[in-house]
Amino acid sequence: MMEEEVRDAIISELKRQAETNPSKLKLAEDGERMTVNGEVDLAALAMAIVGTIAGGP
């Protein structure tokens, strides 16, 4: 379903950002919930979501 694809894209992008800059972004997952603490690059997050909707890689 599209919702799952978008959800996965969001999680993947947030994890990528946290791995790239762990001092600025921390994530904690708990089942279907995620706690996000720190700076998020919204442009990169939006691109990941749009890419998923458009059928990108």
Regions inferred by a protein language model and the residue ranges of each:
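Protein-protein interaction and targeting regions used for scaffolding, dimerization, and localization
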Residues: 1-57
